[in-house]
Every structure is written in C-alpha cells, then in structure tokens.
Swiss-Prot record:
InterPro entries documented for this protein: UPF0179
Name of this protein: UPF0179 protein TV1250
Any Pfam family: UPF0179
Domain of life: Archaea
Length: 145
C-alpha cells in the first residue's frame, strides 16, 4: 500500500525520486504537517501518483504542495569492508565522519540525512569504491529495517 505525503507542486511528477530529509521546525504549527512527516527521515522514495489536492505551504516555492502517493525504494550506502559484511545481514550503519569534502561519495559514507544508528538489511554487496583516504570501501544495496 502506498504512503501519502506532500511535495512542492513544482516537484510533483510521477517517477521523481527523493530522500526525505526530515521535518523542519518552521512546520510545527502547520495543519497538514502529519501528512508531510509520515515518511521516515533519510529513506528514499519515488512518487507513484500525483493527486489533484493542493495544500498551502510556507516552505515550498509557490506556497503550494501537492498530495502524492509514494513508494519506499531500496537505497545504497558505501561502507568499510569487513568480515561481517554479508548479504542478508542486519547491520547498524555508522557514519565514517570523513572530512574529505571533495570526494564524490561523501554523502553515502557520512550518512547525511540519516538518523544515527540506522538499521538496514544488506541486500547485495557491490563493487569496490575508490576511497581517496585509502579505506577499503564497498557499495552495498540495502533495505531499511
């Protein structure tokens, strides 16, 4: 069953993918905030249907948000290689806290937009990832727990 959420009317297109960054303090008094915030922070979603319903919003440009149906997607992270890294394992993700800001993988190693101690199931282990700091890193496909 799809989840219902709200997204800026300029972004409300079927097939668009996004990561829910979490609630904003500005939204605490909004009458429809529960619809916006019924998604999990840091999880990846795809819009599957755009409904015609528009709601006011002080955050998005145009001051309007569309009601949309979304599905949660699998995601990937880049994690340090270890003997415990196995398909099917449930692991607690920890940020690398890397300071190499020009690295193209920094968001997936540092777990931006994620809650601390995120639990995931490793669906598949992908290729090696070149780390400019010399760590042995792997790309892994995950599902959220």
């Amino acid at each position: 069953m799809p989840k219902i959420s709200l997204i800026g009317k300029d972004l409300a297109k079927e097939g668009i993918e996004f990561v829910f960054a979490g609630p904003l303090p500005t939204c605490s008094d909004c009458r429809v905030k529960n619809v916006c915030f019924n998604l999990e922070q840091g999880h990846k979603y795809r819009v599957t249907k755009v409904r015609e319903q528009l709601n006011p919003c002080i955050i998005f440009n145009g001051d309007k948000v569309n009601t949309v149906e979304v599905e949660e997607l699998e995601d990937f992270f880049i994690i340090q290689e270890s003997k415990k890294l196995q398909e099917g394992a449930i692991v607690t993700m920890k940020s690398m806290n890397c300071d190499y800001i020009t690295c193209p993988n920094i968001e997936k190693c540092n777990l931006y937009y994620q809650k601390n101690d995120l639990k995931v199931a490793i669906k598949s282990i992908g290729q090696n990832v070149n780390c400019p700091k010399g760590f042995k890193m792997k790309k892994v496909q995950v599902t959220y727990k």
